[in-house]
Regions:
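Solvent-exposed coil/turn segments that connect beta secondary-structure elements
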Residues: 71-73, 93-95, 102-104, 142, ...
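A short, Trp-centered hydrophobic/proline-enriched beta-strand micro-motif
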Residues: 59-74
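Sec-dependent signal peptide cleavage junction
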Residues: 19-60
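One face of beta-strands
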Residues: 64-66, 90, 95-99, 148-150, ...
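Bacterial Sec-dependent N-terminal signal peptides
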Residues: 1-27
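Mid-length scaffold segments of soluble, non-membrane domains
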Residues: 80-134
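Helix-rich interaction surfaces within compact, conserved domain-sized segments
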Residues: 124-195
């Protein structure tokens, strides 16, 4: 009698486990499908936001009033510094260009933020676009402490951009990587300009 009782309990337990395993597999599939659906919605939303940001950045370049807020700066020796975007930027507005660097390890500096701020008049602005939507924008900047060519590349479909500053009298180019936004939407803090 005990054997029959144990056998019956064992069979019920085994059936229950198989039902649990099947429902667990079904739940896993449903969870994966829901996760894929959420990812697709997230990707579509992100793509829409990137498209809107790209159109705003393109309009700002055409209007000549923009700021590239840099997340990192690449130096000629291969060194990359990750920096604060509101104190490291390249901007253009009202025919005036500004380039500012400021580093987190504050030391005495000309602009009071740990770096330099240079301004100058802008000339020779040119803009072109390739078939992939990448925009190439360049200009000359001439001021008391700067004489350089600035080349900006806006990546197609997003507002990610890079600006390469090539000085006219030295070969020490630096590149700012970050996001290009209209000047009015910029969150920049300007230090004291040189001279």
């Amino acid at each position: 009698m005990k054997r029959i009782l144990y056998l019956t309990i064992f069979l019920y337990t085994l059936c229950g486990m198989s039902v649990y395993a099947q429902s667990r597999g079904t739940r896993g599939k449903a969870w994966r499908l829901e996760r894929e659906r959420q990812r697709a919605v997230y990707r579509a939303l992100e793509q829409h936001q990137d498209s809107v940001s790209y159109q705003e950045a393109l309009s700002a370049l055409r209007d000549g009033s923009w700021v590239l807020e840099a997340n990192n700066i690449n130096f000629p020796n291969g060194l990359t510094r990750f920096v604060s975007s509101n104190t490291n930027y390249v901007s253009l507005t009202n025919g005036q260009g500004t380039i500012q660097t400021a580093y987190a390890n504050f030391t005495y500096s000309p602009n009071g933020l740990g770096g330099v701020t240079v301004q100058g008049n802008v000339s020779g602005v040119s803009m072109s676009q390739d078939k992939d939507g990448n925009v190439y924008y360049s200009f000359n900047i001439q001021g008391n402490a700067i004489s350089a060519v600035v080349s900006v590349t806006l990546t197609g479909g997003t507002n990610q951009a890079s600006a390469t500053i090539t000085p006219n009298f030295t070969g020490r180019t630096i590149t700012f990587d970050g996001y290009l936004v209209p000047y009015a939407q910029g969150t920049i803090f300007q230090g004291m300009p040189q001279w």
